[in-house]
């Protein structure tokens, strides 16, 4: 029988609920409890798959092919547990399910309303995660801020939820902000008091308060919050701004978040083993030589658009005892100027995924610069497609080569639409999504890095390498180091006579973990370090 923890947020958005939920998951797992975490998002989109990266940040893809909120990436990285499509719920998906049931006559002619039908569907989704995961504890993060109209059905649903189970099977955590007023030199509790008041008016009494602040909270403030918010003083948890998200579990452990949560759930506070995590944070805080990595992207104005890529680079640098010196490079600026202007001093180049024409020629120029100047390079998804186009144009004597996505009339579509995508009309959830196997080729860098015959990686794309050109690429020196088991789809490519030049059609960043960096990212950083050693 699962226990349930609900995490809400107050005062401001982007308060860090996802990191708190993920950190609690890490702390519970370190005590031997199994955990699954789900996100309730209050927007009307069915999923974030068709949303602009500028609006929503990256789309995180689960093993079973769900396009989800980036917080699921935090959940997976912190708990080292794979989530599924059940772990991502939006208002759009809830309404879609309820309306479909109404059309099928599932409500026997009744009037369909927010209460009880929408809230019941939300509760059923939470129960479904519990039954499918068999986890000891289900943590649910409610997106948005208490007081938002959009969040009301979710808050009502989690209020009702305590009637589905025993009261000691549920704990409510409210993450809030304690602003520091510089002119008066005071930390203010009033916004938190009002946020809790709003939550109580819905019928939810928080059991724990996690108080975000950039100043330490003294005992007097904790007593004040305890009195006004009806929370035990030991359950007022200080969450100071951290130097890294990976240090948050350690600070919340020190504050007693996990211990207090287990008390409300009437579960044993088992011995906590965070030795590996402490080592990770130590290495993060005590890095070695800086590695200048250029991330050449289309959406660099919003760093969250490439969140998993950045974290994968960070994991690799921690493992290799290097300092990640990340350089954000606009692909469009390279088009206006030159690759040399922005990339001349970097130690490694990463070209991540994306969609559409904008900035593609800048990415291609960056890849050419990496190839010709022997700079370690890693291409991801569109990054691989751009690497293929660059080679075709500049080495394989196909100067008019392109992708049929970028130029439908190109005479040499070295990248083309997957055959199964040709009749697809809807955009949402229709790409090649989720985990697929890839067979690695012997005597390749890819095979050496993975040390496996078959790997499983997550995908999110419609376009692939055009096998019509495979032989001409092989003849001109390209190496295909990974394909689908039937050999039909090219998944991983590389070059000889280069320190490190690999590109993959999949998204390895989704499988990188703190303490377990992905082989392709680890290889990139290691190669960069070797280059630096040789040049010195």
Curated annotation (Swiss-Prot):
Binding of CTP, residues: 13, 148-150, 188-193, 224
Stretches of the chain forming a coiled coil according to its record: none
SUPFAM superfamilies xrefs: Class I glutamine amidotransferase-like, P-loop containing nucleoside triphosphate hydrolases
Keyword Ligase on entry: yes
Annotated GO biological process: 'de novo' CTP biosynthetic process; pyrimidine nucleobase biosynthetic process
Binding site for ATP: 14-19, 71
Pathway info: Pyrimidine metabolism; CTP biosynthesis via de novo pathway; CTP from UDP: step 2/2
Record-linked InterPro entries: Class_I_gatase-like, CTP_synthase, CTP_synthase_N, GATASE, GATase1_CTP_Synthase, P-loop_NTPase
Activity regulation behaviour: Allosterically activated by GTP, when glutamine is the substrate; GTP has no effect on the reaction when ammonia is the substrate. The allosteric effector GTP functions by stabilizing the protein conformation that binds the tetrahedral intermediate(s) formed during glutamine hydrolysis. Inhibited by the product CTP, via allosteric rather than competitive inhibition.
Residue ranges constituting the Glutamine amidotransferase type-1 domain according to the UniProt record: 292-534
Binding site for L-glutamine: 354, 382-385, 405, 462
Superkingdom, taxonomy of origin: Bacteria
GO MF term list: ATP binding; CTP synthase activity; glutaminase activity; identical protein binding; metal ion binding
Any one GO cellular component localisation term in the record: cytosol
Enzyme Commission numbers on file: 6.3.4.2
Transmembrane intervals: none
Reactions catalysed, as given in the entry: UTP + L-glutamine + ATP + H2O = CTP + L-glutamate + ADP + phosphate + 2 H(+); L-glutamine + H2O = L-glutamate + NH4(+); UTP + NH4(+) + ATP = CTP + ADP + phosphate + 2 H(+)
Stretch list, region Amidoligase domain: 1-267
Protein family: Belongs to the CTP synthase family.
Record's subunit section: Homotetramer.
Function: Catalyzes the ATP-dependent amination of UTP to CTP with either L-glutamine or ammonia as the source of nitrogen. Regulates intracellular CTP levels through interactions with the four ribonucleotide triphosphates.
Protein name in UniProt: CTP synthase
Species in which this protein is naturally found: Prochlorococcus marinus (strain MIT 9312)
């Amino acid at each position: 029988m699962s226990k349930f923890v609900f995490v809400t947020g107050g005062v401001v958005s982007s308060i860090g609920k996802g990191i708190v939920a993920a950190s609690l998951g890490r702390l519970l797992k370190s005590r031997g409890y199994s955990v699954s975490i789900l996100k309730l998002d209050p927007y009307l989109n069915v999923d974030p798959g068709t949303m602009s990266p500028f609006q929503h940040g990256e789309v995180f893809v689960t093993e079973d092919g769900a396009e989800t909120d980036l917080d699921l990436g935090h959940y997976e990285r912190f708990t080292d547990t794979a989530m599924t499509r059940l772990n991502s719920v939006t208002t759009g998906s809830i309404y879609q399910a309820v309306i479909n049931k109404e059309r099928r006559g599932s409500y026997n002619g009744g009037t369909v309303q927010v209460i009880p039908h929408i809230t019941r569907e939300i509760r059923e989704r939470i129960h479904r995660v519990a039954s499918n995961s068999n986890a000891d504890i289900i943590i649910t993060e409610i997106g948005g801020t208490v007081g938002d109209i959009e969040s009301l059905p979710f808050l009502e649903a989690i209020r009702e939820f305590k009637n589905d189970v025993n009261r000691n099977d549920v704990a409510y955590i409210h993450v809030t902000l304690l602003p520091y007023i510089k002119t008066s030199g005071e930390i203010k509790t009033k916004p938190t008091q009002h946020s809790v008041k709003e939550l109580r008016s819905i019928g939810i009494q928080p059991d724990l308060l996690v108080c975000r602040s950039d100043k330490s909270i003294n005992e007097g403030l904790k007593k004040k919050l305890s009195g006004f918010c009806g929370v035990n003083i030991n359950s007022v948890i200080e969450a100071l701004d951290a130097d890294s998200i990976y240090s948050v579990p350690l600070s919340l452990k020190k504050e007693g978040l996990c211990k207090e949560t287990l008390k409300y759930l009437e579960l044993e506070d088992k011995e906590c083993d965070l030795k590996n995590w402490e080592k990770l944070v130590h290495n993060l805080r005590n890095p070695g030589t800086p590695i200048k990595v250029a991330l050449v992207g289309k959406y660099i104005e919003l760093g969250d658009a490439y969140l998993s890529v950045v974290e994968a680079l960070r994991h690799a640098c921690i493992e290799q005892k290097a300092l990640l010196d990340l350089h954000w490079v606009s692909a469009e600026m390279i088009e206006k100027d030159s690759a040399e202007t922005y990339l001349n001093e970097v130690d490694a180049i990463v070209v991540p995924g994306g969609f559409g024409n904008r900035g593609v020629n800048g990415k291609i120029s960056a890849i050419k610069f990496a190839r010709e100047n022997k700079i370690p390079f890693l291409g991801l998804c569109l990054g691989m497609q751009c690497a293929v186009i660059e080679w075709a144009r500049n080495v394989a004597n196909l100067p008019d080569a392109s992708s049929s996505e970028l130029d439908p009339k190109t005479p040499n579509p070295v990248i083309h639409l997957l055959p199964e995508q040709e009749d697809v009309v809807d955009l949402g959830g229709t790409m090649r999504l989720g985990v697929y196997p890839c067979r690695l080729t012997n005597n390749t860098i890819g095979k050496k890095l993975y040390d496996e015959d078959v790997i499983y990686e997550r995908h999110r794309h419609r376009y692939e390498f055009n096998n019509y050109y495979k032989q001409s690429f092989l003849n001109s020196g390209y190496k295909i180091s990974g394909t689908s088991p039937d050999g039909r789809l090219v998944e991983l490519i590389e070059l000889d006579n280069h320190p490190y030049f690999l590109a993959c059609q999949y998204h390895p960043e989704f499988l990188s973990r703190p303490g377990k960096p992905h082989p392709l990212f680890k290889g990139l950083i290691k190669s960069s370090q070797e280059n630096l050693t040789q040049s010195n």
